[in-house]
Amino acid sequence: MSSTMKDTQEAPVRWSRNWTPDAIRALVDQDNGKLDARIYADQDLYQLELERVFGRSWLMLGHETHIPKIGDYLTTYMGEDPVIMVRQKDQSIKVFLNQCRHRGMRIVRSDGGNAKAFTCTYHGWAYDIAGNLVNVPFEKEAFCDKKEGDCGFDKADWGPLQARVETYKGLVFANWDPEAPDLKTYLSDAMPYMDVMLDRTEAGTEAIGGIQKWVIPCNWKFAAEQFCSDMYHAGTMSHLSGVLAGLPPEMDLTQIQLSKNGNQFRSAWGGHGAGWFINDSSILLSVVGPKITQYWTQGPAAEKAARRVPQLPILDMFGQHMTVFPTCSFLPGINTIRTWHPRGPNEVEVWAFVLVDADAPEDIKEEFRLQNIRTFNAGGVFEQDDGENWVEIQRVMRGHKAKSTSLCAKMGLNVPNKNNPAYPGKTAYVYAEEAARGMYHHWSRMMSEPSWDTLKP
């Protein structure tokens, strides 16, 4: 059988000489709304992130419809570790490290496909779709003395490392840590806000249009935080050209006034966050146009969605953004969803795809696909705006003084409580930074607390 996490125990906890637990905790001051800029640029912190954050979090790898048939597979990443996600004979899904246990070569080098087995191109070790080592060239000659008896080599001991796998309403998540809480516990009270996009119909969702991939030279936390907490940029300067381009011909910017009425959500545990406007469809209209806006907010499909997600007044919610910590981000109503794969402290690789209601009319699915190409893909007008800001921030962070500054995360900190009882969980004003403070506080805890005994919900 394939190796489990317990077969490859990590070394005892060691800390960088620069980053003790107390030093890490001092980087994020949620009570006073201050962030140390080194969290975005320090190489030692990044190496610890790979172990403490990406080695212990539930990471979104794709959608069940990416691998519908037995033997269908998708190669992706958990942090910087390459993995293979495979549909099994019993229709379950396995995820295992894309690393041959002989000399560490990548087992599968294609993006995806269908297979009955995987063979390493270096020495020909072969694994079945469950990750079991099933064939070793010259096994008897290489590992035995050609006498009867124990060869001292058991193929069952040499399968690739297996991750835990759980799904949430079509999304596939994996986790390396056997001690981490189950997925639903990890998602905490964020699930109703995810359901706004994932549970609108009994047919569920499906991924369309393939997976688009591109690299942005910025730290992964800038992207994750923006989708977690930052409606502020959309309401100020960042997206004016994109908004204008998306308006119907008979409208101009003078007819669009972004709302000041809205909320954001900070999860009780886990660093997840979301934000949205209330009773104002102008942002959705300007991004995806009238056809999708009408489908998402009016008519039978919208009414069914409201019945299926009774915890939230979803017909009043517009322009929602959300991040499931650390790197799963999406925009309900626009329906882009992506994982931010870290590539060092100064680079992130974006893997994005489009989700639609599985029973939506074909013309609606196609409209979602086309609007996402226009707005939120590698060349999309809004994606370009966001990326330009993140890239320039990271360039600034090269400087010694720039990395030594304290950044302001005080929005909403001293404002009277804006908690909205219509929305479950802890909520704040839409132009606050409550969700961002929650995200960075959880990041700080994961980085400084090596045991789930203190970290768990």
From Swiss-Prot:
UniProt entry tagged with the keyword Iron-sulfur: yes
Domain (Rieske): residue spans on this chain: 58-174
Cofactor binding summary note: Binds 1 [2Fe-2S] cluster per subunit. Binds 1 Fe cation per subunit.
Stored CDD domains: RHO_alpha_C_NDO-like, Rieske_RO_Alpha_BPDO_like
InterPro entries: RHO_NdoB-like_C, Rieske_2Fe-2S, Rieske_2Fe-2S_sf, Ring-hydroxy_dOase_2Fe2S_BS, Ring_hydroxy_dOase_asu_C_dom, Rng_hydr_dOase-A
Binding site for Fe cation: 233, 239
Enzyme class, broadest EC rank: oxidoreductase
Keyword Cell inner membrane: no
Cofactor: [2Fe-2S] cluster; Fe cation
Matching Pfam families: Rieske, Ring_hydroxyl_A
Gene Ontology biological process terms in this record: catabolic process
Residue positions binding [2Fe-2S] cluster: 100, 102, 120, 123
Reaction(s) the record says it catalyses: biphenyl + NADH + O2 + H(+) = (2R,3S)-3-phenylcyclohexa-3,5-diene-1,2-diol + NAD(+)
Single GO MF descriptor: iron ion binding
Superkingdom in the source lineage: Bacteria
EC numbers, comma separated: 1.14.12.18
Record key words, sorted: 2Fe-2S, Aromatic hydrocarbons catabolism, Dioxygenase, Iron, Iron-sulfur, Metal-binding, NAD, Oxidoreductase
Pathway(s) served: Xenobiotic degradation; biphenyl degradation; 2-hydroxy-2,4-pentadienoate and benzoate from biphenyl: step 1/4
Assembly with partners or alone: Heterohexamer consisting of three BphA subunits and three BphE subunits. A ferredoxin (BphF) and a ferredoxin reductase (BphG) must be present to obtain activity.
Family that this chain belongs to: Belongs to the bacterial ring-hydroxylating dioxygenase alpha subunit family.
Name of the protein in its database record: Biphenyl dioxygenase subunit alpha
Organism: Comamonas testosteroni (Pseudomonas testosteroni)
Gene name as annotated: bphA
